[in-house]
């Protein structure tokens, strides 16, 4: 799972968000809790970079429900709520 997260980060940096999402999906089944947290956060980032704010918002809400102690994710969730409500 760690390797897939690394690949996903490279894909995000290179602007290949679909490949990043594919690598995240491949990494999730074998991920430890910490790896899953990283993969799922990067999934939010990838959807946001694709300008798919609705999906990013859904993923961010699920993430915050699973990892409520993650303050960065809470800020991301608040940001995404502003992006989706203004598109509405």
Question: Can you name each region flagged by the protein language model?
Answer:
Residues 32-34, 68:
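Short coil turns that delineate tetratricopeptide repeat
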């Amino acid at each position: 799972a760690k390797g897939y997260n690394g690949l996903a980060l490279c894909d995000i940096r290179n602007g290949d968000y679909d490949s990043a999402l594919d690598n995240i999906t491949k990494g999730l089944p074998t991920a430890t809790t910490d790896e899953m947290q990283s993969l799922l956060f990067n999934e939010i980032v990838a959807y946001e970079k694709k300008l798919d704010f609705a999906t990013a918002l859904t993923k961010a809400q699920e993430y915050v429900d699973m990892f409520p102690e993650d303050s960065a994710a809470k800020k991301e969730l608040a940001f995404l709520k502003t992006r989706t409500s203004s598109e509405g």
